[in-house]
A protein has these predicted regions:
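Membrane-interface aromatic/basic loop that binds lipid-linked glycans or pyrophosphate carriers
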Residues: 18, 133, 290-341
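Single conserved hydrophobic/aromatic residue that forms the stacking wall/gate
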Residues: 1-16
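Short, acidic, metal-binding catalytic loop of nucleotide-sugar glycosyltransferases
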Residues: 44-53
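Short aromatic/hydrophobic "clamp" motif used to bind/position activated sugar donors
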Residues: 107
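A conserved acidic beta->alpha catalytic loop
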Residues: 52, 60-70, 87, 111
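N-proximal low-complexity "stem/linker" segments adjacent to membrane-targeting elements
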Residues: 14-45
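Glycine-rich, basic loop-to-helix element that forms the pyrophosphate-binding segment
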Residues: 1-2, 86-102
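Donor-binding/catalytic cores of nucleotide-activated saccharide
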Residues: 91, 112-220, 230-240
């Protein structure tokens, strides 16, 4: 009888050890750099999740402010939180570091100035599990940080399951699906088995998210706004600079290169052309604005022509697809500022 009781206690102990040592279901990757006023709210929203089987990887991108001091409070009080420190390399490098350190079945990215609803992980996880989907996606809300007021203009989606081709087409063309790294849950193997990393550039999400969807069997969509995107400053158009202008079209070239290497360009050529047209128009506005702000119109006509050359070059497909990042032989140049008199 005693041996039976002993065996029973041993089984309980073994199960407990297995539960304590097994990998978490979800790895949350939070890049951190200069977000001291916002990080506590972000981490509190993670700590308050109804889904508890996660690890929160806080990637310190050599943040010079007090962000990590705040993060250390969470690490000290909750074993699910940990900090990984790296030399400053930007958002993409921080995300890539987080992926390298992750062990969960799924990966979620949360920007450290944003925050999430309490059921964010639970609903995205259930959407994947119940539909046997490699990825899930939810709506999001712009949160105006200026006065702490939620903007009523939400990016709402309907509950559905998108099959592979529809999801890829929609995320490339920015039609019904946005290419942000956040507001999604990914099977970790999408990144690890296909060696997907974020390139060091602006619009790295645009250049990467279609790849993740391409390798997903399908995409489960949760029809609720569960992610809060904090708008801290001006709109994307008002903060465009020459590097962003060039990277905007280059992000499409990266996806075009990827599709051509995988023999799928023809399947999504319409979507590539649609997003090229959209970005080309955005760049026309941005180029003119750059020259107005510089009080110099010298070179503006040349820059506008270059914008069209870039778009045409990407679409002509006369360049050879490469295993790494492709080369775009054209670039818009910064206007030379005139001194105000």
């Amino acid at each position: 009888r005693d041996r039976s009781v002993s065996r029973g206690l041993g089984d309980v102990y073994k199960r407990q050890i297995m539960q304590e040592t097994k990998n978490p279901e979800i790895s949350i990757i939070i890049p951190v750099y200069n977000v001291e006023p916002y990080i506590r709210r972000c981490l509190n929203s993670i700590k308050a999740q109804t889904f508890t089987d996660f690890e929160a990887i806080i990637v310190d991108d050599s943040s010079p402010d007090g962000s990590i001091k705040i993060a250390m409070e969470f690490v000290a009080g909750d074993s699910r939180f940990k900090i990984v420190t790296r030399e400053n390399g930007g958002l993409s490098a921080a995300r890539n570091t987080g992926i390298e350190h992750s062990v969960g079945r799924y990966i979620a990215f949360i920007d450290s100035d944003d925050f999430i609803a309490p059921t964010y992980l639970e609903k995205l996880y259930n959407a994947c599990e119940e539909n046997n989907a490699d990825m899930s996606y939810c709506g999001f809300t712009y949160y105006i940080d200026k006065n702490g007021m939620k903007k009523n203009q939400m990016f709402i989606v309907k509950d559905c399951v998108m099959e592979h081709n529809e999801a890829v087409a929609r995320i490339i063309s920015d039609h019904g699906l946005h290419s942000y790294a956040w507001n999604k849950l990914y099977k970790r193997t999408i990144f690890t088995e296909h060696k997907i990393t974020y390139p060091t550039m602006y619009f790295e999400d645009v250049a990467t998210s279609p790849k993740t969807v391409f390798y997903a069997n399908k995409l489960a969509v949760v029809g609720e706004c569960l992610y809060f995107y904090v708008k801290r400053q001006g709109s994307i158009l008002s903060t465009m600079n020459v590097k962003k202008i060039n990277d905007l079209l280059y992000s499409v070239m990266i996806i075009s290169n990827f599709l051509r290497r995988n023999g799928e360009y023809a399947s999504f050529e319409t979507e590539i052309r649609r997003i090229i047209t959209k970005f080309k128009l955005v760049n026309i506005y941005s180029i003119i604005r750059q020259h107005i702000l510089a009080f110099s119109f010298k070179g503006m006509h040349s820059n506008l022509k270059t914008n069209f050359k870039m778009a045409r070059y990407i679409l002509d497909c006369e360049w050879t697809p490469t295993e790494g990042l492709p080369e775009l032989p054209y670039a818009v140049k910064a206007p030379i500022k005139k001194d105000k008199k």
